[in-house]
Swiss-Prot record:
Protein name, entry field: Ectonucleotide pyrophosphatase/phosphodiesterase family member 3
InterPro entries in the cross-refs: Alkaline_phosphatase_core_sf, DNA/RNA_non-sp_Endonuclease_sf, Endo_G_ENPP1-like_dom, ENPP1-3/EXOG-like_nuc-like, His-Me_finger_sf, Phosphodiest/P_Trfase, Somatomedin_B-like_dom_sf, Somatomedin_B_dom
Tissue: Detected at the tip of villi in the small intestine. Detected on basophils and mast cells (at protein level). Detected in the epithelial layer of the small intestine; expression is higher in the proximal part and lower in the distal part of the small intestine.
Species this protein is from: Mus musculus
Membrane in keyword set: yes
Cofactor list: Zn(2+)
Lineage: Eukaryota, Metazoa, Chordata, Craniata, Vertebrata
Cysteine pairs bridged by disulfides in the record: C54-C58, C54-C71, C58-C89, C69-C71, C69-C82, C75-C81, C82-C89, C98-C115, C103-C133, C113-C126, C119-C125, C144-C190, C152-C364, C380-C477, C428-C817, C561-C623, C574-C679, C576-C664, C786-C796
Record gene name: Enpp3
Keywords assigned by UniProt, alphabetized: ATP-binding, Calcium, Cell membrane, Disulfide bond, Glycoprotein, Hydrolase, Membrane, Metal-binding, Multifunctional enzyme, Nucleotide-binding, Repeat, Secreted, Signal-anchor, Transmembrane, Transmembrane helix, Zinc
Function in brief: Hydrolase that metabolizes extracellular nucleotides, including ATP, GTP, UTP and CTP. Limits mast cells and basophils response during inflammation and during the chronic phases of allergic responses by eliminating extracellular ATP, a signaling molecule activating these cells in an autocrine manner. Metabolizes extracellular ATP in the lumen of the small intestine, and thereby prevents ATP-induced apoptosis of intestinal plasmacytoid dendritic cells.
Length: 874
């Protein structure tokens, strides 16, 4: 068939079909319009009463205004409920908010909260009643309030304090997701917030919550982990056991008891320890923990406590929510689950602020929102198994990101278990090993994690996002977790605060959560119990600080070590051929130790720009030894300097170290021989040699002899001295260039009982062989520079910057796996691992720094509690 013919015959058929389709569409459209108009007109003409709405008629048995339907409690059984009965009368009792349908409702006795007209008088309104039903603007949209005085209703003489914990809310969440969290973001905008708050190690829930309310390190308050064993109790503690309610585990004085002991009342809607009879007492009001109670119930109950009569009303409140921690564990920190959890806690916080505003308390209450720790991603591909290191596992291991190892056979073998062998067998086993084993006394001092029998001696510091397990399949490994090194950025927690006592619209520098307890006491105008915080270090958060700190008074003033003779009465088995082989040179060198008053003033100005360290030890017999390039505080009993101080300016382009002077040591003629070390002390001990506390890294060759004297000697393990020398010869110069000069204070530390405080003489257990010269457990170095680096440290008009280190003094460098490595590959990392606060140095040495710096004491305390960090990855 011809194709043109086929096309011609098909064309009329297509046109007929199209015409029918158009007609059908028009007819259907017309019918749709007619039906719509009919329904609209019919419903519009129907009277409102005939619709049978239950609005304002819920459970009313009179049936007034209802035709053909009912709103009483029996309508469901009869099947004659009005169309909106379920939404208006049933679901309204199951929500915590008002809506336009609920406003003015009949009082629903089973409702969670009320939107009835009399709810304000009855004090049972939903938190948003005034916003929804009376047209007030919500708290979240209002401008930031500003006032020097509390805006409190009658009966609130002291602003209440609310401590709100959001478990596992890491600081980065607030930066990343703040636009999704309108309520918390408003608090951040109007109040104060820190870049982060540092959790204590291990970064776990119970240890950190209890630290926040006691101001104590976990080693001090006893809750050293979520799981632990106490050999004296012979019991195990866990979050799922009844033992967690045994007061024997809980030491210290939580803030609710501090408040109660001083005449205030306290109420806790959950907080680790609040449902335990610590010291025999519970908070005034508390609830036994249950994670099934909705956040809205917790918020509503706290608001009801604020409604109590003045005589019964608490001054301090805690509230705790489990998110976003729970979502972080199950989904990991970067997940939709965490975002949803963050929004749920933001809604809960918004509900609290709406409820406070409804009571006119939103600018009266001092509220702190914080977290206990952060969260990090984990994976089953990033797990270290002990079965890869031991042929047979014959020990018990607390697994995860902060593992501890102890004997299985408890209590019999608890104290005889060979932790040293465990640590030795786990040290430097693989080039890509993702943990470092430590005996707890050797852990970085900034962790304060050693002095408690519940802290097992063998400990692993695990790399970020890695886990350590006993064997494969022994625990869950996916999702997220926490517990890691508290310097990891992923472990950083939030801190926000708002209220009449706090400054406004300010970002503050990071601080540690041990400081929160003292802050809470200041807000409540009460005296804190002894704690590990530094009282006054957070005064800059407050408009009018309650506590005014002052410098500590010196307990031992320096004695005189005067120059009496240019030649020693006893050479102390020392020799310096370069001086002694030429008549008069040794006497000439010793005369340099006899400084005039003007020379003393000049060296003090240059080398002690912030004042000499004060000695806080009783019977700390010492004297000051002045030199042109350094000054020492010489400890007579220990026969070595307690500290040396000197300033290293930024070197010029052509500067170099003075040449070394080999085999040269001489007696310091200013110190009695009986109070001096002999050069022969180090001949018998092959593992120990002498080091110089002041390393003579500046000045002329002539001034270098000022350092080669017995009063500058300190005992050092030979392997440690390699690291010490590299630090002073290379890193110190590097830091001086970076910071435009440094003031350096260094010295020995004795902490044989590893309690974080200086030892009494009878606690020191190791000495240079055959002598009474004690061997330090650590050495400290405090580097101070000017924050404004256009100034040098000896002429700094403003804030200072500090970089302190407390380095364990050990016979080997196995911590750094340094074998076959040059110092440039490991020394700086080793020092950074042992960075500390100035306050840590003070506690370990009995010294007190910066007393002559012209700055308010509270600002000096900020400096002393600052911890340098070197982590940049989250």
């Amino acid at each position: 068939m011809d194709s043109r013919l086929a096309l011609a015959t098909e064309e009329p058929i297509k046109k007929d079909s199209l015409k029918k389709y158009k007609i059908l569409c028009v007819v259907l459209l017309a019918l749709l319009v007619i039906v719509s108009l009919g329904l609209g007109l019919g419903l519009g003409l129907r009277k409102p009463e005939e619709q049978g709405s239950c609005r304002k008629k819920c459970f009313d048995s009179s049936h007034r205004g209802l035709e053909g339907c009912r709103c009483d409690s029996g309508c469901t059984g009869r099947g004659d409920c009005c169309w909106d009965f379920e939404d208006t009368c049933v679901k309204s009792t199951q929500i915590w908010t008002c809506n336009l349908f609920r406003c003015g409702e009949n009082r629903l006795e089973t409702a969670l909260c009320s939107c009835a007209d009399d709810c304000l008088q009855r004090k049972d309104c939903c938190a948003d009643y005034k916003t929804v039903c009376q047209g007030e603007s919500p708290w979240v949209t209002e401008a930031c309030a500003s006032s020097q005085e509390p805006q409190c209703p009658p009966g609130f003489d002291l602003p209440p304090v609310i401590l709100f914990s959001m478990d596992g809310f890491r600081a980065e969440y607030l930066q990343t997701w703040s636009t999704l969290l309108p309520n918390i973001n408003k608090l951040k905008t109007c109040g104060i917030h820190s870049k982060y708050m540092r959790a204590m190690y291990p970064t776990k829930t119970f240890p950190n919550h209890y630290t926040i309310v006691t101001g104590l390190y976990p080693e001090s308050h006893g809750i050293i982990d979520n799981n632990m064993y106490d050999v004296h109790l012979n019991k195990n503690f866990s979050l799922s056991s009844v033992e967690k309610s045994n007061p024997a585990w809980w030491s210290g004085q939580p803030i609710w008891l501090t408040a109660m002991y001083q005449g205030l009342k306290a109420a806790c809607y959950y907080w680790p320890g609040s449902d335990v009879a610590v010291n025999g007492s519970f908070p005034t009001i508390y609830r036994n923990y249950s994670n099934s109670v909705p956040y809205e119930r917790r918020i509503t109950t706290l608001l009801q406590w604020l409604d109590l009569p003045k005589a019964d009303r608490p001054s301090f409140y805690t509230i705790y929510v489990e998110e976003p921690d729970s979502a972080g564990h199950s989904s990991g920190p970067v997940s939709a689950g965490v975002i949803k959890a963050l929004q749920s806690v933001d809604n809960a916080f918004g509900m609290l602020m709406e409820g406070l505003k409804q009571r006119n308390l939103h600018n009266c209450v001092n509220i702190i929102v914080l977290a206990d720790h952060g969260m990090d991603q984990t994976s089953c591909d990033r797990v270290e198994y002990m079965t890869d290191y031991f042929p047979k596992i014959n020990f018990y291991m607390y697994q995860g990101p902060a593992p501890r190892i102890r004997t299985r056979n408890i209590p019999q073998d608890f104290f005889t278990f060979n932790s040293e062998e465990i640590v030795r067998n786990l040290s430097c086993r693989k080039p890509d090993q993702h943990f470092k084993p430590y005996l707890t006394p050797d852990l970085p001092k900034r962790l304060h994690y050693a002095k408690n029998v519940r802290i097992d001696k063998a400990h692993l510091m695990v790399d970020r996002q890695w886990l350590a397990f006993r064997s494969k399949g022994s625990s869950n490994c996916g999702g997220g977790t926490h517990g890691y090194n508290n310097e990891f950025k992923s472990m950083e927690a939030i801190f926000l605060a708002h209220g009449p006592s706090f400054i406004e619209k300010t970002v503050i520098e990071p601080f540690e959560n041990i400081e929160v307890y003292n802050l809470l006491c200041d807000l409540l105008h009460i005296e804190p119990a002894p704690n590990n915080g530094t009282h006054g270090s957070l005064n800059h958060l407050l408009k009018t600080p309650f506590y005014k700190p002052s410098h500590a008074g010196e307990l031992s003033t320096p004695a005189d070590c005067g120059f009496t003779t240019p030649l020693p009465t006893d050479p102390l088995d020392c020799s310096c051929p370069a001086l002694q082989n030429t008549p008069g040179l040794e006497e000439q060198a010793n005369q340099r130790l006899n400084l005039s008053e003007g020379e003393v003033a000049a060296t003090v100005k240059a080398n002690l720009p912030f004042g000499r360290p004060r000695v806080m030890q009783k019977n700390g017999d010492h004297c000051l030894l002045y030199h042109r390039d350094y000054i020492s505080g010489y400890g007579k009993a220990m026969k070595m300097p307690m500290w040396s101080s000197y300033t290293v300016l930024k070197p010029g382009d052509t500067s170099s170290l003075p040449p070394t002077v080999p085999d040269c040591l001489r007696a310091d003629v200013r110190v009695a021989p009986s109070e001096s070390q002999k050069c022969s002390f180090y001949l018998a001990d092959k593992n120990i040699t002498h080091g110089f506390l002041y390393p003579a890294i500046k000045g002329t060759n002539e001034s270098r002899y000022d350092a080669l004297i017995t009063s500058n000697l300190v005992p050092m393990y030979k392997e440690f001295k390699k690291m010490w020398d590299y630090f002073h010869e290379v890193l110190l110069i590097k830091y001086a260039i970076e910071r435009n000069g440094l003031n350096v204070v260094s010295g020995p530390i004795f902490d044989y009982n590893y309690d974080g405080h200086f030892d009494a003489p009878d606690e020191i257990t190791q000495y240079v062989a055959g002598t009474d010269v004690p061997i330090p457990t650590h050495y400290f170095v405090v580097l101070t520079s000017c924050k404004d680096q256009t100034h040098t440290p000896d002429s700094c008009p403003g804030w200072l910057d500090v970089l302190p280190f407390i380095v364990p003094h050990r016979p080997t460098n196995i911590e750094s796996c340094s074998e076959n490595k040059t110092e440039d590959l490991w020394v700086e990392e080793r020092f950074q691992a042992h960075a500390a606060r100035v306050r840590d140095v003070e506690l370990l040495t009995g010294l007190d720094f910066y007393q002559e710096k012209a700055q308010p004491v509270s600002q000096i305390l900020q400096l002393k509690t600052y911890l340098p960090t070197f982590e940049t990855i989250i």
